[in-house]
């Protein structure tokens, strides 16, 4: 009997470890890939990503506030008329599940997990498109090095110049949410032209218990793109965001097994970025993962002004 119990415990441990690694790998790959491309606007590099400063919007390029995901400054998915378009912005969910500055009301309070981060990423997707492809339920950006024109799928494609490129424009939001069974999951919202910000059906990865980002900040009087310090999300100032001084991200995710084990007691303490998470003696196995990403596009495109 003792041999059987030991064998079962070993099998259970191996299964949990495999599950943790696979869920963690999927989550980290999704996050790092999108973070690498945050603030990517194709060949448009001449001016800030803001309406009236190189960017124009078509008549159909609008999203109702009720269908959008607004940040702490009230800016939504599309380029604003005041201030610049944040290619990346991260907000914290506090212990009462409130989000920094009242941001992202698109995420119901019941669908939030306390003491985690919400990651907002705006960027262009994939490779330049043929004009005939710009017909879907999406927003598109026609770009040159000096100008960018946004339009809705099905509208007339901006003529601009023969050298212009055509891209799909997206706004992704990653956050953690409990499922019906109470297990934590990584969820993702994306932008549509007809419905605004829409939640992708089903989790992107299961068992993601915590997600925290530390940011590398360039403090040089004249920004040189070098990291001078890492700070928690809450300690990045509005000026540092808008001036492109946030040049790197360190992503921490804590993955938890989907079921507790009767043969395991977790008394470990995990340092998830700036937050310590205790196993509290429960039966869930956990795995802490970390990865770093350079944020070159926001630094290049920073135009100043909040």
Go through each PLM region and give its residues:
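Aliphatic-rich helix starts adjacent to a transmembrane/signal segment
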Residues: 1-40
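N-terminal pilin/flagellin-like segments and related low-complexity appendage regions
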Residues: 27-248, 252, 258-285, 290, ...
């Amino acid at each position: 009997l003792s041999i059987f119990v030991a064998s079962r415990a070993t099998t259970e441990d191996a299964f949990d470890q495999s599950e943790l690694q696979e869920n963690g790998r999927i989550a980290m790959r999704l996050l790092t890939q999108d973070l690498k491309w945050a603030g990517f606007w194709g060949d448009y590099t001449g001016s800030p990503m803001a309406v009236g400063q190189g960017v124009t919007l078509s008549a159909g390029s609008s999203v109702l506030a009720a269908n959008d995901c607004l940040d702490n400054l009230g800016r939504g998915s599309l380029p604003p008329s005041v201030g610049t378009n944040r290619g990346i912005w991260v907000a914290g969910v506090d212990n009462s599940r409130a989000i920094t500055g009242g941001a992202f009301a698109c995420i119901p309070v019941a669908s939030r997990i306390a003491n985690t981060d919400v990651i907002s990423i705006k960027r262009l997707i994939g490779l330049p498109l043929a004009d005939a492809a710009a017909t879907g339920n999406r927003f598109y950006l026609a770009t040159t090095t000096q100008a960018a024109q946004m339009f809705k799928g099905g509208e007339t494609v901006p003529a601009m110049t023969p050298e212009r490129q055509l891209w799909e424009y997206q706004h992704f939001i990653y956050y953690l949410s409990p499922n019906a069974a109470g297990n934590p999951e990584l969820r993702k919202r994306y932008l549509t032209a007809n419905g605004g910000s829409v939640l992708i059906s089903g989790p992107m990865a299961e068992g993601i218990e915590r997600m925290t980002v530390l940011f590398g900040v360039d403090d040089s009087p004249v920004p040189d793109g070098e990291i001078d310090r890492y700070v928690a999300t809450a300690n990045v100032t509005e000026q540092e965001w808008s001036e492109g001084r946030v040049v790197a991200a360190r992503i921490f995710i804590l993955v938890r097994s989907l079921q507790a084990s009767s043969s395991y007691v977790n008394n470990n303490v995990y340092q998830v970025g700036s937050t310590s998470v205790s196993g509290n003696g429960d039966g869930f196995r956990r795995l802490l993962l970390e990865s770093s990403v350079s944020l070159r596009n926001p630094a290049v495109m920073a135009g100043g002004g909040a």
